[in-house]
Design a protein with these regions (language model features):
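Polysaccharide-binding and catalytic clefts of secreted carbohydrate-active enzymes
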Residues: 1-100, 106-109, 115
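General secondary-structure edge motif
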Residues: 50, 138-139
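Carbohydrate-binding surfaces of carbohydrate-active enzymes
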Residues: 71-73, 109-122, 126-133, 139-206
Length: 206
């Protein structure tokens, strides 16, 4: 997900630092982009690519400082991959230098599962399966069991190609525990995941 993108990371301080790094001023047109505002479906300009690289260098350096603090307390550092994570893209060339122990992300489909499970340079990956335990699903007219089954079917096939190390759910546990049959459904999901995980260890999918 990229709700705002690099265009939302501009500030007077950043522009000053970019000019020192790149050797030229960052112009408004590099963001306006002829009115397209650097949509993900646009080929970025050379100047915008420079800005992306600059931000990746800066953000990864800052992220490493935070990870080092976490490690100094003997804890693992895990990043949630989602919403707005510019600069720390796991497939970027500076990601490995952050030193994260793990990455967790929301699994909406087989595509997003692979985006998480294929990440290199971390000790393990985790998928947050759907639905979230929120009132918009666990309500009159909602179908959390159906959503859980549908999400698992989409994720399961991708899991066979590139397994996650862990799965989980998020939200208000009381909503899940009070919904008839939901915990039983999740138990089935967890059992299947464990079987796949055990059978896939060290075994190529093709």
């Amino acid at each position: 997900v990229e709700w705002f993108g690099y265009s939302a990371s501009v500030s007077p301080y950043i522009l000053e630092q970019f000019e020192k790094w790149a050797g030229y001023k960052f112009r408004p047109e590099y963001i306006v982009d002829q009115g397209y505002h650097n949509s993900m479906f646009r080929v970025p300009s050379r100047q915008f690519l420079d800005f992306i690289e600059f931000q990746q260098i800066e953000v990864c350096a800052l992220a490493k400082e935070l990870v080092d603090i976490v490690h100094s307390y003997g804890k693992e550092a895990m990043m949630f991959l989602g919403d707005h994570w510019i600069g720390t893209e796991p497939y970027g060339k500076y990601f490995a230098g952050i030193g994260l122990d793990a990455v967790v992300g929301s699994v909406g489909s087989g595509v997003t599962l692979r985006m998480i499970s294929d990440i290199k340079g971390v000790d393990y990956t985790e998928g947050r399966l759907l639905p979230y335990f929120f009132p918009d699903v666990f309500c009159e007219g909602g179908d959390p069991i159906g959503e859980a089954r549908d999400n698992w079917r989409k994720a399961r096939r991708a899991l066979l190609r590139s397994p996650l190390d862990r799965i989980g759910y998020g939200g208000y546990l009381k909503l899940a525990s009070n919904w008839p049959g939901f915990i039983d459904e999740i138990q089935n999901v967890v059992t299947e995941f464990r079987q796949i995980h055990e059978n896939m260890q060290g075994t190529p999918s093709y």
